[in-house]
């Protein structure tokens, strides 16, 4: 087959997946898969929080609006933390008041304590998130308290949110490995996830913060968590440090999880885990899901364009393999 013909076939197949076409059916080779997956876009918050150069507010707003226009149903917009700790998020109020806020899109914000929750409410936030850990060492270095103490702090936020009618999402970091203590017990992950859910978190996102997970360790962790909580209240949040993120997500899908966190252009990392590379790229997750025939309601091409936009502003290559590959076709 000639190169020109091969390239033409590649363009056709890629165009099918970019458009959300079902190139492949739900085959038994992959096991049971959800027919629809909800993507939670974390790029504007988790993706940008580590950038040393402050990203202009209008750029953040433009990025969020582009992602919303692409059909992403949940976009984590910003974080109501002290600018002393995360300077990049100092413009949280301006961001929340400037984005378009489409009626079919949720714009949750991170609120680590009651002060942050109150500030978020004053800025018009309609959903918030809290952030905990399954690693005692990570919890102490990240939020300067034990896991038990962090849960107590979150209770204030949960109580205030309940009174205000605000839904709360929970994050559990270091679900398979910790940069300080190594392996993390699946039983501990299950314990923390259940406590968050019992407190009132409608959804608990399980984060492989430093990206050391494999399908084997992710499966073992999920087996433990699924003994305590149904798959319908769980989400998977993977980093791609060792190139395992998509395989890990597929494993979670096969086990019944149907919510996936991802970051446009693979932006982000963790300010407390220096070796961790970016979150799994939204574009790459979409390409895999669409190729499996799973509905997302998201326009992949528009997400690619949003990723290229923010990467031009940041002056860095796009971290999405799909975005990079399609730019060469």
Residue ranges and their predicted role:
Residues 2-329:
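Catalytic cores and adjacent flexible loops of soluble metabolic enzymes
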């Amino acid at each position: 087959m000639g190169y020109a013909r091969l390239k033409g076939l590649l363009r056709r197949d890629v165009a099918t997946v970019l458009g959300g076409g079902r190139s492949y059916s739900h085959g038994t080779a992959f096991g049971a898969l959800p027919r629809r997956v909800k993507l939670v876009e974390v790029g504007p918050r988790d993706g940008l929080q580590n950038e040393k150069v402050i990203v202009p507010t209008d750029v953040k707003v433009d990025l969020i609006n582009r992602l919303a226009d692409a059909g992403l149903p949940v976009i984590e917009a910003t974080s109501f933390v002290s600018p002393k700790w995360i300077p990049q998020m100092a413009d949280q109020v301006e961001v929340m008041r400037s984005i378009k806020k489409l009626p079919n899109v949720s714009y949750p914000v991170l609120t680590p304590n009651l002060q942050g929750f109150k500030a978020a409410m004053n800025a018009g936030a309609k959903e918030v998130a809290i952030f905990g850990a399954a690693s005692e060492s990570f919890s102490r270095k990240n939020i300067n308290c034990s896991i038990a103490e962090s849960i107590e702090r979150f209770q204030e936020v949960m109580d205030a949110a309940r009174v205000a009618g605000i839904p709360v999402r929970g994050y559990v970091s270091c679900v398979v490995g910790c940069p300080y203590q190594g392996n993390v017990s699946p039983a501990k992950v299950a314990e923390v996830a259940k406590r968050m859910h019992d407190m009132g978190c409608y959804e608990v996102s399980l984060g492989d913060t430093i990206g050391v997970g494999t399908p084997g360790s992710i499966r073992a962790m999920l087996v433990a968590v699924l003994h305590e909580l149904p798959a319908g209240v769980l989400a998977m949040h993977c980093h791609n440090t060792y190139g395992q993120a998509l395989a890990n997500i597929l494993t979670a899908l096969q086990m019944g999880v149907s919510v996936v966190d991802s970051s446009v252009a693979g932006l982000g990392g963790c300010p407390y885990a220096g070796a961790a590379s970016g979150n799994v790229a939204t574009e790459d997750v979409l390409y895999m899901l669409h190729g499996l025939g799973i509905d997302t309601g998201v326009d992949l091409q528009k997400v690619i364009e949003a990723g290229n936009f923010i990467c031009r502003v940041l002056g860095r290559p796009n971290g999405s393999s799909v975005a990079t590959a399609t730019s060469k076709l």
